[in-house]
Design a protein with these regions (language model features):
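Short aromatic-glycine motifs in intrinsically disordered, low-complexity regions
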Residues: 11-19
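Surface-exposed binding/hinge segments that line
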Residues: 1-9
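Short, glycine-/polar-rich solvent-exposed loops and beta-turns at beta-strand/coil boundaries
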Residues: 150-151
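Short clusters of hydrophobic/aromatic residues that line enzyme substrate/ligand-binding pockets
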Residues: 7, 17, 159, 195
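Short helix- or helix-capping micro-motifs
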Residues: 155-157
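Extracytoplasmic/periplasmic ligand-capture domains
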Residues: 21, 26-147, 163-194, 198-244
């Protein structure tokens, strides 16, 4: 965390810093209407090259609203999901920006239990064989093509492309090996195609944040792919307060 903290004046770094940030960058925050917009103005004391854009207004919009604003010519730049990359808007050009941001799934690694008065864990994903099978049984390239319109790269960890990324985390897509892992671990297919072990059905839910079309589409694609392995996944839109 400290590696990404900018130069901050000591007198301004207190409990109110998050509401009134001060730094040495190109812009100063002049107005923040929470949940609506934030307005920046050029920093007259900026040490670098001359700032050509003197004022920036960032509007907080969901993906659909951002796309609609661009179509109506109400925004100079609109950030939207790769799932909308096939949209053509007069007067705009599509820019693909390299990023270390990725979208993955978090799976419980402990068996069902209670901690601090709250239930945690999962009887299916606590089996390492299931997690390994999912890792090699998911076709990431298919997800990129079908969900992201080809705008993306496969991810194998939470830190792909970062300096500390370990290339050995990368795995080859091998659905046959994934099925073999599950068989060897005792997860056998039932008459409906879904696996079971010791009376536990290979089924769990995956949550995504409402309003995030990419997370939703990835979750649904994941469910379709895992069913081919004999794992049943249901998808559910829920806020972070519910998911965590």
């Amino acid at each position: 965390t400290m590696a990404i903290v900018g130069i901050v004046p000591e007198h301004a770094y207190d409990e109110n810093y998050g509401q009134n940030p001060i730094g040495s960058g190109r812009y100063l925050m002049k107005q923040w209407d929470k949940g609506q917009q934030v307005i920046f103005e050029a920093n007259p004391d900026y040490y670098g090259e001359e700032i050509k854009i003197k004022k920036l207004t960032v509007l907080f919009m969901d993906e659909d609203a951002a796309l609609a604003a661009a179509m109506a010519g109400q925004a100079d730049v609109a950030h939207t999901a790769a799932s909308y990359a096939d949209q053509v808007i007069d007067g705009y050009q599509l820019l693909r920006v390299a990023s270390v941001d990725n979208r993955g799934i978090n799976l419980p690694t402990v068996s069902p239990q209670e901690r601090n008065g709250k239930p945690i864990g999962n009887a299916v994903t606590s089996d390492a064989a299931v997690r390994r099978a999912i890792n090699i049984g998911i076709d990431r390239e298919e997800m990129i093509d079908n969900v992201l319109n080809g705008y993306g790269t496969p991810a194998y960890s939470v830190c792909d492309k970062m300096p500390w990324y370990n290339p050995s985390a990368q795995v080859a897509y091998d659905p046959d090996a994934a099925k073999q892992l599950l068989e060897e671990a005792g997860w056998t297919q039932g008459s409906d195609g879904i696996r079971e072990k010791d009376g536990v059905r290979a089924a769990f839910s995956v949550m995504y944040t409402p309003g995030d079309s990419v997370r939703q589409a990835l979750a649904e694609d994941l469910a379709n792919q895992l069913r081919e392995l004999g794992i049943e996944v249901t998808t559910e839109g829920a806020g972070w307060d519910v998911a965590y």
